[in-house]
UniProtKB/Swiss-Prot annotation:
Keywords: Cytoplasm, Glycosyltransferase, Purine salvage, Transferase. InterPro entries: PRibTrfase_dom, PRTase-like, Pur/Pyrimidine_PRTase, Xanthine_PRibTrfase. This is Xanthine phosphoribosyltransferase. HAMAP family: XPRTase. It catalyses: XMP + diphosphate = xanthine + 5-phospho-alpha-D-ribose 1-diphosphate. Converts the preformed base xanthine, a product of nucleic acid breakdown, to xanthosine 5'-monophosphate (XMP), so it can be reused for RNA or DNA synthesis. Its main location: cytoplasm. Pathway: Purine metabolism; XMP biosynthesis via salvage pathway; XMP from xanthine: step 1/1. It comes from Ectopseudomonas mendocina (strain ymp). SUPFAM superfamilies: PRTase-like (SSF53271). The keyword Glycosyltransferase applies. The lineage of its organism: Bacteria, Pseudomonadati, Pseudomonadota, Gammaproteobacteria, Pseudomonadales. Xanthine binds at L20, N27, K156. One of its GO terms (cellular component) is cytoplasm.
Length: 190
C-alpha cells in the first residue's frame, strides 16, 4: 500500500535494526485518513470471504481493525491485555509475548462475543515473530470459530512471523512489508 509506505518513510523512526517507531500515525497519534485507507484495503483484500467478525489486540490494532470493520460492515472485538471489573466471566484466555516491550501478557475476550459460527479476520498493527497473531488465533480456536485470514499493517519480513503463520496454513496479508531496518533507513520488500 503505497500511501502507508510513504507515511512510514516520512514519519517512521528507525530505533534499531529490529524496531520501527510509528507513533506519529499508528500507535500513539492516529492518522484517521490513513486508517480509513487501511480499512478499505483490508476490506478489499478479504472481500467475499464470509467474514463475520474482526479480532485484534489492544491498543494499537484497534484503529485499523475498526476501520476494516466499518468497511466490511461487521463487529470488531479487541482482546484486552488485562482483566477489568467488567471482563471477568466466561473468558477465552491466552498469553502473548510482546517483542517491543519484551514482556508476556495475558489477553482475554468474552466468550459471548465469539461463537463457532464465526469466521474471523485477525488484524494487528505489526507482525514480527507472530506471537500476538498466534495468541489471537488461540482465542478464536477456543471459541470453535474459524480463522479466515490475518491482516497486518506493517510486517517485519526479516523476522519469522509470516513463515510461522503460513506454515500453519493461515493466509497473511500485509500492507507494508519491511525487508530491513538498517542505518536508520527502512527498506521495503516489495
Amino acid at each position: 500500500m503505497e500511501s502507508l509506505k510513504q507515511k512510514i518513510l516520512s514519519e517512521g523512526i528507525v530505533l534499531s535494526d529490529q524496531v520501527l517507531k510509528v507513533d506519529a500515525f499508528l500507535n500513539h497519534q492516529i492518522d484517521p485518513a490513513l486508517m480509513q485507507q487501511i480499512g478499505h484495503e483490508f476490506a478489499q483484500r478479504f472481500a467475499g470471504q464470509g467474514i463475520t467478525k474482526i479480532v485484534t489486540i489492544e491498543a494499537s490494532g484497534i484503529a485499523p481493525a475498526v476501520m476494516a470493520g466499518l468497511e466490511l460492515g461487521i463487529p470488531v472485538i479487541f482482546a484486552r491485555k488485562f482483566q477489568s471489573l467488567t471482563l471477568k466471566d466466561d473468558l477465552l484466555i491466552s498469553k502473548v509475548f510482546s517483542f517491543t516491550k519484551q514482556t508476556e501478557s495475558t489477553i482475554a475476550i468474552s466468550a459471548r462475543h465469539l461463537t463457532a459460527a464465526d469466521k474471523v479476520l485477525v488484524i494487528d498493527d505489526f507482525l514480527a515473530n507472530g506471537h500476538a497473531a498466534k495468541a489471537l488465533i488461540d482465542l478464536i480456536q477456543q471459541a470453535g470459530a474459524q480463522v479466515a485470514g490475518i491482516g497486518i499493517v506493517i510486517e517485519k519480513s526479516f523476522q519469522e512471523g509470516r513463515n510461522l503463520l503460513e506454515s500453519e496454513g493461515y493466509r497473511v496479508e500485509s500492507l507494508a512489508r519491511v525487508a530491513a531496518l538498517e542505518n536508520g533507513q527502512v527498506r521495503f520488500l516489495d
